Amino acid sequence: MKTTYNIIATMAFTALLCACDSFLDIKPKGERIPETAADYKTMISHYEIQKMGETYPIYLTDDCYLPDMAFSTGSQGLNTITPSIKRLYTFDKQVFGDGEDDAFWSSSYSRIFTNNVVIREVMDASEGTTAEKSAIRGEALVNRALDYLYLVNGYAKHYNEATAEADAGVPLLLNADISQTNLTRTSVKGVYQQILADLNEAETSLPEEINGNAFHATKDAARGLRARVYLCMGNYAEALKAANEVIARHDTLLDLTRYEVVKPAGMIGRTNVPDADANPESIFIKYAPYVFGLSSKVFPSDSLLNLYEDGDMRKVLFMAETFRGKTLPRPIWVPYVRANTAVSTPELFLIAAECEARVGYMPHALALVNKLRAHRIKDKGYVSLVDKDSVLNFVLEERRRELAFNGFLRLIDLKRLNLDPRFATTVKHVGDTETWVLPPNDPRYVLPIPQRVMRFNANTMTQNER
């Protein structure tokens, strides 16, 4: 049976972001029944489906700094941020009040609902070839896998093979019915198994190449995401295999040393660095929920700033000590470039390099990182190391430099690296009169399930300890 659906608005997202009575805090609104393959492609092409990779969890990490009082108009401080962001930054056990919406949860499940409709129905659509309909379905599978990867990394403990089968993950919904009640949380292992199943199935039906930009998925989109999934699972051999398979076809890097700040006092158009849709590094594009992500919303921490060398164009182009004509006490994050939160060449280089350093050939790890650095740092990007632990540490530092403020990848990295005492990090947020501390593996690394969702499933769903 076809699902009544508004293919123009995709879903009533304005309603979704407000209070609504549903076990998942989502509320689809039907106005039209999709019939053709083109209708279903419109659904997965909608702007709201292209947004993925929530940014607010970054405030739990060691990458960001917020002053007690905002330094200037438009910049953030503890006196100007929302109550929920302040609670995150100060590691409060409560994050959202009863009347506050958690857009990460609600928008993720809204997208999952949309993709479930497409997965279930598109092959029966009129018009369109079987190959076209299979590609649409494959992309919906990739979309669903990526949403679940973010959800399970936000609302559950990090994947640990020893405990993943017992650790509570997130509700795993694989159909288009949101009327279900009394839901339970699938285990972390179960969620990861479904993510891999979706990606494996998607790969068989997606094309190798597409015409146009990378907003639509190819086989390499599925392979690239699989590399990220296996890295999260600590399966370095499989992560390396998947990353290398994509790098063999996509090894182009943007040379940031050729770009510059063209409007030092500006915001949009401050640099001539291209957005993701015009960036040759983009393999599969998703944007952060907000137009320019965390631009002007956060200050890089001292520990992050100290990782960048002189001549590192990531610091030159994406950070500034002046904002809106005012000199600030410290650099602010102001790239004003629409970055890609899905699959890109630099992340795959870093996945492959980390896996080579752990289970592969150390010179390959260095070669990958040095190639990336040659496209990021003027004159002196090359590094020579011989000790395996030193190489691994350097790769992890490079990952932090390159992926700073990209969705909440740093939070995922902290959670996975905290499982290894060699890399465990105590996060400290220092204010004028108070310091807030988040020890390794603290339960506050895991976001709480929204309170409205818990009320609808009070007898079957467990809340995260914080």
Give the predicted meaning of each segment.
Residues M1-C20:
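Sec-dependent bacterial lipoprotein signal peptides
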Residues C20-P67, L304, K380-G381, D420-R466:
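Membrane-proximal, proline-rich intrinsically disordered regions
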Residues G30-E35, D63-F71, K157-A166, V170, ...:
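Short, surface-exposed recognition loops and adjoining beta-strand edges that mediate ligand/DNA contacts
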Residues A37, K41-P57, G190, M233-T345, ...:
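Extended ligand-binding clefts on enzyme/binding-domain cores
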Residues T82-Y155, T186, L199-E209, Y336, ...:
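Conserved, well-structured interaction surfaces
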Residues I112-N115, Y192, L199, A243, ...:
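Inward-facing hydrophobic residues that define packing positions of alpha-helical scaffold repeats
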